[in-house]
């Protein structure tokens, strides 16, 4: 839960007000210049209009060097960040041939599979030689290899569902699947902080969409009771079906879903549960099986389980795991399955190999070690950040930990200074977050050593003092018992 102090809120609003005022003033003079030069083609309306276009031109471009930084190596614990420069006040960024070796705190490489792996990489290279980079076809027309069917069976076994279906892109998994599950006459109840892919999927479904307060089973029950009592708009007929959509770990908050309580509410009102485990599958739980394992939930109680391969497994794509009837329905009706080229075979092999390492089926215990390390690293880093006085969102065991920045001036200051000290962080602002709630999102990996984390904490602490984002008093250092006895 964000605890935004009043003074911070006022200074943040004042900063945005100044930026808006100066932006409007610059736009006024730009219109005068364009009118005299007759620059615009007569009769054509401007393509880009509105406040979002204004935000991009007058606010985002000032700090765009803090986003989309290209890299020149695998996104391991350390990677090479390409240096860029601008000759036109940040409107255009140009790459140089120079790179900076930085500690990586931005990638979703939770288990460290994104870099070369002694077990996975040789198998991926072998699959590339055998199957080529692409099937050049859709799943229903020559695009299904032995690897695709093997991965579907393996995913179903791993998450504890009867069947699974693969997709070549994680975002599409949500945005294309949801309209196939519910349509006109149906009701979607979505967490207020669900990912944009869920939002777009719900909008495109034609179903009625209602939102409940973030991670609040009590408010979810209120919304369900109200909607069931009222029925469909205008006709007041009963809903054809109701689907409640939540995430395992919320990617911008680092919070775990209150899954047991939400499932209890859904069962009470006969609503289906749709769980997005993009950031939790493979990253949490004793054996990496996500929030169901971590929170003691039977996978059979979750009707539809979604996940991606881009985080813990070091690949690309996504999956849906559910009953055989639902999966068969999706294979025959989902455009992303019927019309899109199937997942790249080497990418499929990477996921197969990664899951086998996690399960210990590679003949080693590296998977268990990775899971223990990501849990230990995450909890250590979160605890130390809080001790320093930062406002850190999220729960224990979550590898995602946002550090609140708030003020727009602190976004580039924090990002650029960390990069200067060779720590690469991701800063997130509007429209990915509410306007007043800008943050830096730290992602921890099992590939980080304790020395890496201590270095990162040292840099972040110094930059935090410089930028002024330690919103709470730091804990005093603990005196060892022996030293305490000496003092006495």
UniProtKB/Swiss-Prot annotation:
Membrane topology: Single-pass membrane protein
Broadest EC class assigned to this enzyme: transferase
Coiled-coil intervals, chain numbering: none
GO BP terms, alphabetized: ceramide biosynthetic process; sphingosine biosynthetic process
Residues with N6-(pyridoxal phosphate)lysine modification: 311
Transmembrane segments: 4-24
GO cellular-component term (any): serine palmitoyltransferase complex
EC numbers: 2.3.1.50
Record note on quaternary structure: Heterodimer with LCB1. Component of the serine palmitoyltransferase (SPT) complex, composed of LCB1 and LCB2.
Protein name: Long chain base biosynthesis protein 2a
